[in-house]
Amino acid sequence: MALRRPMVAGNWKMNGSAQLALELFNKFATKLQDDSAEVVLCPPSIYLESVRQQLDANKDALNGCLVRMGAQNLSQHDFGAYTGEVSGQMLKDSGCRYVIIGHSERRRMYGETSDIVAEKFAAAQKHGLTPILCVGESGPAREARRTFEVIAEELDVVIEKNGTMAFDNAIIAYEPLWAVGTGKSATPEQAQEVHAFIRKRLSEVSPYIGENIRILYGGSVTPSNAADLFAQPDVDGGLIGGVSLNSTEFLSLCSIAMSA
């Protein structure tokens, strides 16, 4: 069985501040104990520099703890007249290691199709970034028992455009749309069922990828339900939304992941 290091990725969405970055690192420096889990902060692009400054300032205090920086989105284009967009190279220059791709809010609010998501996935890897690919079903799709069908379609488009081995440098986040920002989380059993399906799906085309890829759960993860979620055999941590804005609760999730 592969030893997959747990990850807790905080997606601030359009929230946060330079002060939040300071608060988080003040607690990381004294509370994070080891490198048994990886912590990723994904602030709005305007605060990437604030997070980077805190990473540099606390390098010694973190003492080898794995705290990384990620972005919430990127353009599928390398450069050009795309007002308001940020390229993969720009994110790499800013110190990012990860980037969230295909979040349900991007798909729903900004019309990002699976084809666009696949292009962004490729753009991230082209510039040395590890994509955190989000997949998940809506409430009606779950009620219609189409969960596996929807997720398979979202995965297959990325595989068709980028090849299976592209997932050798990628993270997957399962985020059921009916749980994102609603306060209603999937049960540990529901999460495990879908994570196991994703792993099996990838194993069919590459046993190595299926065994080794990290699959995060995203959807109203809190300190009260994280231990049961993270204890599932195919759940390798969480993509955290609202709780990532509370330094105390986010640190609690990091500690839970480290002991999972």
Swiss-Prot record:
Per UniProt, the enzyme's principal EC class comes to: isomerase
UniProt KW keywords = Cytoplasm, Gluconeogenesis, Glycolysis, Isomerase
Keyword Isomerase on entry: yes
Q: Name one GO molecular function term.
A: triose-phosphate isomerase activity
Q: What is its EC number?
A: 5.3.1.1
Q: What PROSITE patterns does the entry give?
A: TIM_1 (PS00171), TIM_2 (PS51440)
Q: Which family does it belong to?
A: Belongs to the triosephosphate isomerase family.
What protein name applies here?
Triosephosphate isomerase
